[in-house]
Swiss-Prot record:
NCBIfam families linked to this entry: hslU, PRK05201.1
The species this protein was found in: Shewanella sediminis (strain HAW-EB3)
Pfam entry (one): AAA_2
GO biological process terms, semicolon-separated: protein unfolding; proteolysis involved in protein catabolic process
Family: Belongs to the ClpX chaperone family. HslU subfamily.
Positions of ATP binding: I18, G60, V61, G62, K63, T64, E65, D254, E319, R391
SMART domains per record: AAA, ClpB_D2-small
Molecular functions (GO terms): ATP binding; ATP hydrolysis activity; peptidase activity; proteasome-activating activity
Stated role: ATPase subunit of a proteasome-like degradation complex; this subunit has chaperone activity. The binding of ATP and its subsequent hydrolysis by HslU are essential for unfolding of protein substrates subsequently hydrolyzed by HslV. HslU recognizes the N-terminal part of its protein substrates and unfolds these before they are guided to HslV for hydrolysis.
The protein, known as: ATP-dependent protease ATPase subunit HslU
Gene: hslU
Key words of the record: ATP-binding, Chaperone, Cytoplasm, Nucleotide-binding, Stress response
Assembly information from the UniProt record: A double ring-shaped homohexamer of HslV is capped on each side by a ring-shaped HslU homohexamer. The assembly of the HslU/HslV complex is dependent on binding of ATP.
Length: 441
């Protein structure tokens, strides 16, 4: 789990996301509170529940990007889901409990990788011995002898193997046969039963090994994975993963505004209000049955986000509103924000285009006034048509760089300067013509 302070988390988010300081502070405090809670006494720790967050802001201002970056910083089980993918229990579509099952699967993967790293040294030793056995098979009379072979020849081959002199030599080895993939069409709401059936059929399949011929370099990597997998205790791994989910799990619910009930309508609303009702026990705290064991959701942190352009947060059912106590509003982006987005973040849009053209030996230089013109053009199109936030910059940049990208292979060694005049000549007609802006930008 991450031990970064809120200030460090905000600083890390600042390298990728421009503005939205309030939202960054809220998620940073929430992430730090996960660590603070774990420092408390076990009895008192159970009483401290996470304060879930609702992020409100127009599209393209950084809500989803904050979630993506937070996932990398958290070093904890994290899953991002679209609220629109789920329906009420009993109807066609995914049940909300699938969120916790997917979160548990990601924790299992994380724990397995962590345990395999810990036993990597032993796995490398075992893989080395298997390769040497394939290169120097024991005499028939020594097959039952368990003593390690420390002959001079074996040591010479061991030295060559470690120095990489045998990498290209082909050997024939026994590797675990791949599991047979069995696809089962699941009835609505029965995904968990389907998963269990798939696991059962796969375990019934042939568990023996298969003889394959491959270069030593490739065989060594494969054997390390096999040996590491043998050293991992599956029961301990599952226990650790479930503990990790229950104490540190984070769920990011995107597009929650799309499941608000709009206006007065009669009849069941299975993909909106029904989903909200099903989310209540998850957010409040319940026990979900997964194929790895029972998972309690009492201390899982939920971060919900939505644009709320066609609805408002008060359109959520009151019970769900009460379970999202921290509200953060993200502001719409200005032309100055666009200018900063083009230059300040790590691997910014301008840096990406310079690097891409550099592969063709074409040098691109963006001037200060050129960047200002691009930012202004994107902002104007957003104001006149639909405001899609920073995503508009991608459209504008692709349109601006289209000619250069097409001719780059024929202009190797040349330098091109993207200044205000260049931007004006390529974008002015589209920006000024509202009809063209709607269809092209």
């Amino acid at each position: 789990m991450s031990e970064m302070t809120p200030r460090e988390i905000v600083h890390e988010l600042d390298t990728h996301i421009i503005g939205q300081h309030d939202a960054k502070r809220s998620v940073a405090i929430a992430l730090r509170n996960r660590w603070r809670r774990m420092q408390l006494d076990v009895d008192f720790r159970q009483e401290v529940t996470p304060k879930n967050i609702l992020m409100i802001g127009p599209t393209g201002v950084g809500k989803t990007e904050i979630a993506r970056r937070l996932a990398k910083l958290a070093k904890a089980p994290f899953i991002k889901v679209e609220a629109t993918k789920f329906t009420e229990v009993g109807y066609v579509g995914k049940e909300v409990e699938q969120i916790i099952r997917d979160l548990t699967d990601s924790a299992i993967k994380m724990t397995r990788e962590d345990q395999m790293k810990k036993c990597k040294f032993k796995a490398e030793e075992a893989a080395e011995e298997r390769i040497l056995d394939a290169l120097l098979p024991k005499p028939k009379e020594d097959w039952d002898n368990e003593k390690p072979d420390d002959s001079a020849t074996r040591q010479i081959f061991r030295k060559k193997l470690r120095e990489g002199q045998l990498d290209d030599k082909e050997i024939e080895i026994d590797v675990a046969a791949p599991q047979v993939g069995i696809e089962i069409m699941s009835p609505p709401g029965m995904e968990e039963m389907t998963n269990q059936l798939q696991s059962m059929f796969q375990n019934m399949g042939p568990g023996d090994s298969k003889r394959r011929k491959m270069p030593i370099k490739e065989a060594y990597k494969l054997m390390i994975e096999e040996e590491a997998a043998k050293l991992v205790n599956q029961d301990d791994m599952k226990e650790q993963a479930i503990e990790l989910v229950e104490q540190h799990g984070i769920v990011f619910l995107d597009e929650i505004d799309k499941i608000c009930k709009r206006g007065e309508s009669s009849g069941p609303d299975v993909s909106r209000e029904g989903v909200q009702r099903d989310l209540l026990p998850l957010v409040e705290g319940c026990t979900v049955n997964t194929k790895h064991g029972m998972v309690k959701t009492d201390h899982i942190l939920f971060i919900a986000s939505g644009a709320f352009q066609m609805s408002k947060p008060s359109d959520l059912i009151p019970e769900l509103q009460g379970r999202l106590p921290i509200r953060v509003e993200l502001s719409a982006l200005t032309a100055d924000d666009f200018k900063r987005i083009l230059t300040e973040p790590h691997a910014s849009l301008t840096e990406q285009h310079v690097a891409m053209m550099g592969t063709e030996d074409v040098k691109i230089e963006f001037t200060e006034d050129g960047i200002e013109s691009i930012a202004q053009a994107a902002w104007q199109v957003n104001e006149r048509t639909e405001n899609i936030g920073a995503r508009r910059l991608h459209t504008v940049m692709e349109r601006l760089m289209e000619d250069l990208s097409y001719d780059a292979s024929d202009k190797s060694g040349n330098t091109f300067v993207i200044d205000a005049e260049y931007v004006s000549s390529h974008l002015d007609d589209l920006v000024q013509d509202e009809d063209l802006s709607r269809f092209i930008l």
